[in-house]
């Protein structure tokens, strides 16, 4: 195997993550490597979090994010928690400042092992999300799936958490909707020039909701941190919930999201290590570390 890089297979509340240690290297994880890793059942993932040396003063590392289809992602809250857990275990440090495509993110590991990530501030302008046409109020945009007189899903809220999100509000069980069928259509709808993450959200109380997400570039996932943040912000904007909410995800885990008065959104949850190995960032060829072999 050519010059290899260490990696850890992890998950954040079921969101399948590969944390790749690219520090001290000039190369990048290629789309071909991402596709190869995702094609192997053992390393199948939703996002790769590639840790690079810092590019900006005041930050510890630059984190490049790739989806399972090889495309780039701006944000992944669950993946950032995995990065923090891996680095905290290595260094003993508890607080970190990262640079990502979405900007600067601060994160902290708590004494109980949970990790909080400051996901930054949401954006609501139609050009910021972005949308392909003007909407003066993105708390509800004109978009639906199904017949005009009996739509299956309609009138989502739109918000950016550094990446575009559309949240469809439903009263029935979120599992009763064919998100695997509608997700690709909505992700690639012309209204979203950069595609979008699609979430079905059911509010169960002013402090709780259940969500399912079709992730842009990854498909159906067991959890999506930025979608959880977008859902809470959108719910608070439309007076469905307060600004501090627990979310149950398809992976069975719970995320906590708080939209602070300073407009920053804090995502808190757990992260779990599965195994470690090494891989070729160019081809995706990989080997499991002996000590973590099953």
Swiss-Prot record:
* Localization in the cell: Cytoplasm
**Which is one Gene Ontology cellular component term of this protein?**
cytosol
Annotated membrane-spanning segments are none
Primary location group: cytoplasm
- Does Isomerase show up as a keyword for this record? yes
Catalytic activities: (2S,6S)-2,6-diaminopimelate = meso-2,6-diaminopimelate
Q: Identify the keywords attached in UniProt to this record, alphabetized.
A: Amino-acid biosynthesis, Cytoplasm, Isomerase, Lysine biosynthesis
A GO biological process held by the record: lysine biosynthetic process via diaminopimelate
The question of whether Transcription regulation is a record keyword is answered with no
Biochemical pathway: Amino-acid biosynthesis; L-lysine biosynthesis via DAP pathway; DL-2,6-diaminopimelate from LL-2,6-diaminopimelate: step 1/1
Positions annotated as active site in the UniProt record: 76, 224
Specify which residues bind substrate according to the UniProt entry for this protein: 15, 47, 67, 77-78, 163, 197, 215-216, 225-226
- Pfam families per the UniProt record, alphabetical: DAP_epimerase (PF01678)
Q: What is its EC number?
A: 5.1.1.7
Output the Gene Ontology terms for molecular function: diaminopimelate epimerase activity
Q: Which InterPro entries match?
A: DAP_epimerase_AS, DAP_epimerase_DapF
Q: Where is this site: Could be important to modulate the pK values of the two catalytic cysteine residues?
A: 165, 215
PANTHER family associated with the record = DIAMINOPIMELATE EPIMERASE, DIAMINOPIMELATE EPIMERASE, CHLOROPLASTIC
As for what it does, the entry says: Catalyzes the stereoinversion of LL-2,6-diaminopimelate (L,L-DAP) to meso-diaminopimelate (meso-DAP), a precursor of L-lysine and an essential component of the bacterial peptidoglycan.
Q: How does it assemble?
A: Homodimer.
What family name appears in the similarity comment?
A: Belongs to the diaminopimelate epimerase family.
Protein name (record): Diaminopimelate epimerase
Q: Which organism is it from?
A: Mesorhizobium japonicum (strain LMG 29417 / CECT 9101 / MAFF 303099)
């Amino acid at each position: 195997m050519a010059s290899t890089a260490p990696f850890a297979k992890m998950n954040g509340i079921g969101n399948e993550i590969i944390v790749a240690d690219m520090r001290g290297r000039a190369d990048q994880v290629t789309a071909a490597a991402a596709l190869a890793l995702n094609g192997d059942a053992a390393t199948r993932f939703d996002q790769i979090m590639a840790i690079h040396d810092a590019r900006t003063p005041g930050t510890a590392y630059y984190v490049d994010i790739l989806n399972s289809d090889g495309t780039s992602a701006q944000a992944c809250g669950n993946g950032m928690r995995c990065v923090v857990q891996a680095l905290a275990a290595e260094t003993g440090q508890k607080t970190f400042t990262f640079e990502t495509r979405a900007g600067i993110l601060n994160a902290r590991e708590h004494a109980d092992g949970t990790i909080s990530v400051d996901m930054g501030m949401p954006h609501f302008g139609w050009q910021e999300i972005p949308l392909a046409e003007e909407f003066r109020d993105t708390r509800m945009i004109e978009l639906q799936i199904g017949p005009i007189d009996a739509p299956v899903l309609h009138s989502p809220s739109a918000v950016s958490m550094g990446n575009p999100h559309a949240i469809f509000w439903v009263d029935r069980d979120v599992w009763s909707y064919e998100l695997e069928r509608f997700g690709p259509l909505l992700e690639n709808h012309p209204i979203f020039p950069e595609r979008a993450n699609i979430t079905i959200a059911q509010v169960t109380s002013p402090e709780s909701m259940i969500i399912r997400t079709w992730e842009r570039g990854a498909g159906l996932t067991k959890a999506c941190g930025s979608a959880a943040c977008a859902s809470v912000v959108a719910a608070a904007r439309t007076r469905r919930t307060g600004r501090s909410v627990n979310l149950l995800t398809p992976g069975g885990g719970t995320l906590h999201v708080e939209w602070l008065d300073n407009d920053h959104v804090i995502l808190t949850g757990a992260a779990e290590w599965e195994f470690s190995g090494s891989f070729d960032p160019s081809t995706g060829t990989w080997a499991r570390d002996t000590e973590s072999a099953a």
